[in-house]
Regions:
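Short glycine-rich, Thr/Ser-proximal phosphate-binding strand/loop in the N-terminal lobe
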Residues: 26-62, 66-69, 140-141, 145
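Phosphate/pyrophosphate-binding loops at sites that engage ATP/ADP/AMP, CoA/4′-phosphopantetheine
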Residues: 67-80, 219-231
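A short acidic Gly-Thr/Ser loop motif
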Residues: 31-35, 86-87, 124-128, 151, ...
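Glycine-rich phosphate-binding loops at beta-strand->alpha-helix junctions
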Residues: 88, 224-254
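Gly/Thr-rich phosphate-binding beta-strand-loop-beta motif of the actin/hexokinase/Hsp70
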Residues: 23-45, 118-135
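Glycine-rich phosphate-binding loop plus the immediately following alpha-helix
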Residues: 60, 137-178
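Short beta-strand-loop/turn "lid" adjacent to the catalytic site in phosphate-handling enzymes
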Residues: 46, 53-56, 71-105, 133-141
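Adenine-nucleotide phosphate-binding core of ATP-dependent small-molecule kinases
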Residues: 190-222
Length: 254
């Protein structure tokens, strides 16, 4: 059942060529992560026709069905060839007998195709984080362990502590004035750092920026482990559109 990206592309092309005799064939990409489900529908020229994502709250099949319904509502009945990726996708792929592409393979292939100048990719997921180095055709991946410190779940926990969400945390962080040291390796340790600061009157703006800085520190120390982040850097994953990417960029080298 495990497929490489090349195998998936070859099977998709073969299937699509066969189906083109009757109708157009579209590709459906499904990414099932630890906290969200993402789908994208592309035509035979790699143009996006539909894309969306939702948090699944452990209801993966129901969430996927909802997203597929939205796609059908927009595009109508179409012939598709699906491929599944993501940390939570293998079981569903086996159950549905759908090709599965390991997420690092999928990410690396996508970047080498659509952003070939990428030297380093930093991806923060719901419960995992990874750095991918592209060096002379070689791909080196570094991933966090079993702890979700410094990931999207960590940001959600910290946002809840400040009675907001990740987007609200981002808005607060835009106006920070001071930065505090907060541990990101563990949500429990981070809470013990933040609660005294709250009691002492630290602003939500400063705490929010400090939380994002903690994520950066965890990425640098826990994943890069001293290896330089230089050149063209791609930021991937749900948490990175918020302030963390802006704080992280100064750590990369030209």
């Amino acid at each position: 059942m495990f497929q490489t990206e090349d195998n998936c592309e070859e099977k998709a092309a073969t299937r699509c060529r066969r189906d083109m005799t009757m109708n157009k064939c579209y590709r459906l990409g499904i990414d099932i992560g630890s906290t969200t489900v993402k789908i994208a529908v592309l035509d035979d020229e790699n143009h996006f026709l539909f894309s969306d994502y939702e948090r699944h709250f452990a209801n993966i099949q129901e969430t996927l069905a909802d997203l597929l319904t939205k796609a059908v509502d927009k595009l109508g009945p179409i012939d598709i060839y699906p491929v599944i990726t993501g940390s939570g996708g293998l079981t569903l792929a086996q159950y549905l007998d759908v090709p599965f592409a390991q997420e690092v393979v999928a990410v690396a292939e996508a970047l080498q195709t659509y952003a070939p100048q990428t030297d380093v990719a930093i991806e923060l997921g719901g419960e995992d984080a990874k750095i991918i180095y592209f060096e002379g055709g070689n791909v080196e991946q570094r991933m966090n362990g079993i702890c979700a410190g410094g990931t999207g779940s960590f940001i959600d926990q910290m946002a809840s502590l400040l009675q907001t969400d990740a987007t609200g945390l981002n808005e607060y962080a835009k106006n920070y004035k001071s930065m505090y040291s907060i541990a990101a390796r563990c949500g429990v340790f981070a809470k013990t750092d933040i609660q005294p600061l709250i009691n002492e009157g630290a602003t939500k703006e400063d705490l929010s920026a400090s939380i994002f800085q903690a994520v950066v520190n965890q990425t640098i120390s826990g994943l890069a482990c001293g290896k330089p982040i230089r050149g063209h850097v791609a930021f991937l994953g749900g948490p990175l559109p918020v302030r963390a990417s802006g704080v992280l960029y100064p750590y990369s080298e030209p």
